[in-house]
Amino acid sequence: MVVKRSDGSYVFHFVNVVDDLEMEITHVIRGEDHLMNTPKHLQLIEAFGGKAPQYAHIPLILNQDGSKMSKRDAGAAVGDYPRQGFLPDAVVNFIALVGWNSKTDDEIFTPQELIQRFSLEGVNRAPARFDIEKCAWVNLQHIAKMDTASFAAAAKPFVEQAGLPIPENFEAIAASVKEKVRLLQEVPAAVDFLVKDEFAYDDEAVTKVKGNAQAVPLLAMLAATFSVLSEWSADAAKNALAEVAKEAGAKTGQLMFPLRVALSGRPHGPDLADILNLLGRERCVARLNRFTEILTS
């Protein structure tokens, strides 16, 4: 076995074994592509009079199409995960699931739970397929389990990087979208209409509202009713909405969608009650008036 090159440098196998022995490594877990190297390493360890670590060779991680994963493929660069807003615990959770069977229906684990459950015996023999969408789903589950303060703190840098303001009630704003986002990088787009008054309207949503002949008069009546409420709360606003619909001989549902689009510019998002509370009376009335102008222009 050649251990030293003609230029005096040592080959990988020699350096690898020396490193493991010096650091008293007890377990070496590596890809199955290193399987052919193990006999050489065992020979070197024996020659050094050292104690061999326990070797385990696990299946390679493949792309969805079955090709070998390379550093240029999606999900291969570790630095991409924090930039996209993956939580460290979620990434560890997902990587553990790639090629390992927990023997249960559970898929979401904390690092401590993984330490308690993981065993090499549970690693599958067949190569695993890497699924970045599954990783995002795991991240969503971990976000949902976070407390509000921790989520707001984690999301804040992404919102600031997007050039959006951070209002005093940002923690409450973050809480309203906590179960709506998969990645922290999605938070800015989810909260932009809550932290600033200039935002884009979804074209399809606006077209749908325009198709409702009662939308403009109903929204105008609602703005007038909101402006004279004795006190402002989501419940009071919803009661006013029901009264306006009843007075106009319409169903409450006919007003809910136009109201959401008027306040947020989009067809989906946080709970309408959260939007009403977070925006407050003045901003809600202003947005209703602005949207009725858009519908009639």
Model-derived features with residue positions:
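Active-site cores that bind ATP or allylic diphosphates and position pyrophosphate for catalysis
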Residues: 1-57, 62-69, 77, 102
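Residue-level signal for inorganic ion chemistry
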Residues: 20, 41, 66, 91, ...
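Small-residue-rich helix-loop
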Residues: 148-248
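Short helix-capping/linker segments at secondary-structure and domain boundaries
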Residues: 23, 99-104, 144-148, 185, ...
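Charged substrate- and nucleic-acid-binding regions of tRNA-handling and nucleotidyl-transfer enzymes
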Residues: 235-295
